[in-house]
Curated annotation (Swiss-Prot):
Keyword Metal-binding: no
Compositional bias annotation for Low complexity: 124-133
Protein's recorded name: Cyclin-dependent kinase G-2
Native organism taxonomy: Eukaryota, Viridiplantae, Streptophyta, Embryophyta, Tracheophyta
Active site: D489
Chain positions with Phosphotyrosine modification: Y376
Length: 710
């Protein structure tokens, strides 16, 4: 079949000369044929059969050569030669299809070739073409239709115009391999034998034959378009029509002169009554196909010319010719309708890799003054040049980091950007400086921190003012714990105040998310004065109770205007706690004996002397606290973490509902804002910072995961 597929392309001229000589000889022999109907039957012993096969095979291959897009492009022969050859040709020879040398007994489609061609020749001999079974012509099998696209249907539609053609060799790229034989469309697998078709041909009138031919042309068109898309979409270029699912590579046109009939496309624009819209199975394009058998010659030629020029247009696209724009500007209706009906997939959005591309520059802010500098970074007061808003710029310290961006700052940015609560400081955005080493967090500006305010105050807060501040603190801590976040560094210097009486929790550098069951964490968290006893004793599994201990220490500091436990070391801190609250034991703190730091001998003090520091009534200037207030403070400073009060339970405590009631935020005392110099001169007593302790141990080479008693 390979020889039949491509071999006839190069010896066309020799075959045509031989066929012309045989055509005149056959015209004489036709008159002496013994069959009464005048229709020739192909015999195995007839010396003319081999010439018929060669001529029919050449013509079948020539038809495919005209349209398959794999080989050479052909031009239609002159009309004088066509008319002369039509007179010499038998009426039934057009229907012989592809004459291959390898088969003799398989049936061929009679309606596809015999009926349509004879109806267009208009000869009455075909109407009486019923023959005896003994001398019936044997048709060649449709081997070509299984392996390659259908012959160009323009030959069938034009009738006398394009029965035969002369090959024209053009320098084209070598043909790609054809699809495999086992990939056969379902439409082409159904064939009819001549025994089933020819009796109906003999009894029909020429008008009926014409209608049958028209319907066969439309069926051919459907089969051809489907086969064309299946066989050629596999070889389409990757850069052609990327937006469409499967690019289409069209077949070559018959002649450049066919483009002159583009103006006739308007008749085939809209489908008439009874037309069916068939979808190409490989390209996603819809093509309007007609099932009406009443449309004849001129309309067929117009439709076929549209398809032919459609193929030529895409060939120009594939070949990269420069006249694409001129051709497309002259196109009408059907090709554009087909293109417009194709839903183009939406392109995926362009994804950026630079994570800091959307960050603003720090130059868009005007620095006013330096507020504070601590372990975690430097804080500036600045003004947004666009909006005029006063904000706080916290610069992340990068010079001490050996492994990239600081983990503490990453956690803080991640948590604060995901939280929004009135009692938690709001981080608006992250801005960058001239390099990646200068990164700033833009936060809302708060005039004071609680520690600086208390140092500036001459008198401690009243109980109503303490209740107002404690309610805001507990609401913020409850929000954190409800979202599975441990702050792990609650202290008065991390509580910000403004002149509207609002309190906000800040500095989430040590905070982290936790889960259930608990996982071991480092105990080097929380500033020493506010660190829970279980952390001081070396436990690694802790939960929200460590934050509630810090809340209790803050409450006591608000009432007394000084820290409750101000030890300088872990041992001294535990000693101060035990002297005030009593030495714990297994009875009041289950699991206490298993803690790592219990091996050290502490002072044995069995009494809780917290009430002595916060009496109900005082004549010596000590801070007073009601029974309900003392109960709340005592439950917050419980040794056993399981019995320690939670934030939700603390908010429901009766102390907040007794007289004096919490003061409104609007009536809270205000203070002038302090700059960095004022803060440094006012702070005489500074609590040890856990990160400073850890950095000091790293410098000394004594990095440990255990506490003092490990």
């Amino acid at each position: 079949m390979a020889a039949g597929r491509h071999g006839g392309y190069r010896d066309y001229e020799a075959r045509e000369r031989e066929l012309d000589a045989e055509a005149s000889r056959r015209s004489k022999e036709q008159q002496h044929h013994h069959h009464p109907s005048g229709r020739h039957q192909r015999g195995d012993s007839d010396p003319r059969c081999e010439a018929d096969r060669r001529r029919d095979g050449g013509r079948s291959r020539g038809g495919r050569e005209l349209s398959n897009g794999y080989g050479h492009r052909r031009s239609p022969p002159p009309r004088s030669r066509l008319s002369a050859r039509l007179g010499d040709r038998e009426p039934g020879e057009v229907l012989s299809g592809s004459a291959s040398d390898d088969s003799g007994g398989r049936p061929h489609r009679a309606r596809e070739n015999g009926v349509s061609s004879s109806s267009r020749d208009g000869e009455s001999v075909v109407a009486a073409s019923a023959s005896s079974p003994s001398k019936k012509r044997k048709f060649s099998p449709i081997i070509w239709d299984r392996d390659s696209p259908k012959p160009m249907h323009s030959d069938v539609a034009k009738g006398k115009k394009a029965v035969d053609s002369v090959p024209t060799e053009l320098p084209l790229p070598p043909p790609p391999p054809l699809p495999p034989q086992d990939h056969i469309p379902e439409r082409l697998a159904v064939e009819k034998s001549p025994m089933d078709v020819e009796p109906a041909v003999a009894s029909e009138s020429p008008e009926q034959l014409q209608e049958h031919a028209e319907s066969r042309v439309m069926e051919e068109e459907e089969e051809y378009s489907t086969m064309r898309n299946i066989s050629t979409s596999r070889w389409a270029g990757a850069n052609d029509d990327e937006e469409e699912g499967a690019p289409h590579r069209k077949k070559k046109s018959a002649s450049p002169a066919d483009s002159a009939e583009l103006g006739q496309r308007k008749k085939a624009l809209s489908p008439e009554l009874g037309e069916v819209v068939a979808s190409d199975i490989s390209g996603g394009r819809t093509m309007s196909r007609s099932s009406d058998s009443g449309r004849l010659g001129a309309d067929e030629n117009e439709d076929l010319e549209v398809d032919k020029d459609d193929y030529m247009d895409v060939d120009r696209d594939d070949d990269g010719n420069s006249d694409i724009a001129n051709h497309q500007s002259g196109m009408d209706s059907e090709y554009e309708v087909r293109r417009s009906e194709t839903p183009e997939p939406v392109k995926p959005p362009h994804r950026c890799i630079n994570m800091l591309q959307g960050c603003r520059s720090v130059d868009e802010f005007e620095r006013l003054n330096k507020i504070n500098e601590g372990t975690y970074g430097v804080v500036y007061r600045a003004r947004d040049k666009k909006t005029g808003e006063i904000v706080a710029l916290k610069k992340v310290k990068m010079e001490k980091e050996r492994e990239g961006f600081p983990l503490t700052s990453l956690r803080e940015i991640n948590i604060l950007l995901s939280f929004h609560h009135p009692s938690i400081v709001d981080v608006k955005e992250v801005v960058v400086g001239s390099s990646l080493d200068s990164i700033f967090m833009v936060m809302e500006y708060m005039e004071h921190d609680l520690k600086g305010v208390m140092e500036a105050m001459k008198q401690p807060y009243s109980q109503s003012e303490v209740k107002c501040l404690m309610l805001q603190l507990l609401e913020g801590v409850k929000y954190l714990h409800d979202n599975w976040v441990l702050h792990r560094d609650l202290k008065t210097s991390n509580l910000l105040l403004n002149n509207r009486g609002e309190l906000k929790i800040c500095d989430f550098g040590l905070s982290r998310q936790y889960g259930s069951p608990l996982k071991p964490y480092t105990q080097l968290v929380v500033t020493l004065w506010y660190r829970a006893p279980e952390l001081l004793l070396g436990t690694k599994e802790y939960s929200t109770a460590i934050d509630m201990w810090s809340v209790g220490c803050i409450m006591a500091e608000l009432l007394a205007k000084e820290p409750l436990f101000n030890g300088k070391t872990e041992f001294e801190q535990l000693d101060k706690i035990f002297r005030t609250l009593g030495t714990p034991n297994e009875k009041i703190w289950p699991g206490y004996a298993k803690l790592p730091g219990v091996k050290v001998n502490f002072v044995k003090q069995p009494y809780n002397r917290l009430r002595d520091k916060f009496p109900a009534a005082s004549f010596s200037g000590r801070p007073i606290l009601s029974e309900a207030g003392f109960d709340l403070l005592n439950n917050l400073l419980t040794y056993d973490p399981e019995k320690r009060l939670s934030a939700d339970a603390a908010l429901q405590h009766e102390w907040f509902r007794e007289v004096p009631l919490p003061k409104s935020k609007d009536f809270m005392p205000t203070f002038p804002a302090l700059n960095e110099l004022d803060r440094r001169t006012k702070r005489y007593l500074k609590s040890p910072d856990p990160l400073e302790e850890q950095r000091l141990k790293e410098l000394q080479g004594n990095i440990g995961n255990r506490g003092l008693f490990g």
